[in-house]
Amino acid sequence: MDRFFQIMRPRPGAKILDVGGLPALNGVPGLWNDHTTTYKITLLNLPGSFDRFSASELAHYELIEADACNCQLSQSSYDLVFSNALIEHVGNFQRQKLLANFILSASNNHWVQTPSPLFPLEAHCDVPFWWFLTLSQRKRMISEWYHGENPFTARQMASTRPIWASRLRQLFPDSQLTVEYFLGFPKSQIVYRRRNDVG
């Protein structure tokens, strides 16, 4: 998050929409846990996504339950739209485009981050060079996970689409593209736009 704050510099009180955000994930506090008193955070996620959280976990957030690919808000409703590791899960290019259009319409400023398919370990299943395996190899592994001990991973990988840099440029043509590296490998890709003061 350090890079996000350095580049986007949201002001105290900024209205931030986290598309795909949750208050916690697998027991780990969410990205905004230390910032809920500084910013007005709204989490948008699919219906039912917040049901497993307690009232105290949700207390500092505004919540929207909707499919971001089919959601309408007032134009530029937020000072900033943030999305981390969501766009690769929404489906085909048409749905990716719907999500991108929603993000672009909800604010003049955005930060969209997604794992790089070039990183040696796939971010969701930890299989080396997953996106360079043949389709039949990937299908076989997903089938084994379904019928084994990893049905969640199977469902996740069945719906994940790699987002290459060229696709990000198509989806966000007026945004800056930057890459985060780890041990010399591209680990994540970020498209961002900061048109005016955030907040």
Question: Which residues does each PLM region occupy?
Answer:
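A conserved beta-strand element that flanks and buttresses the S-adenosyl-L-methionine
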Residues: 82
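Conserved class I S-adenosyl-L-methionine
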Residues: 102, 109-139
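A short, conserved alpha-helix within the catalytic core of class I
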Residues: 90-106, 114
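Class I SAM-dependent methyltransferase SAM/SAH-binding core
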Residues: 17-71
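Conserved S-adenosyl-L-methionine
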Residues: 174-185
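Conserved alpha-helix/loop element of class I SAM-dependent methyltransferases that forms part
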Residues: 1-14, 25-31
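Short catalytic micro-motifs in class I SAM-dependent methyltransferases
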Residues: 85-89
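Short alpha-helix
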Residues: 154-176
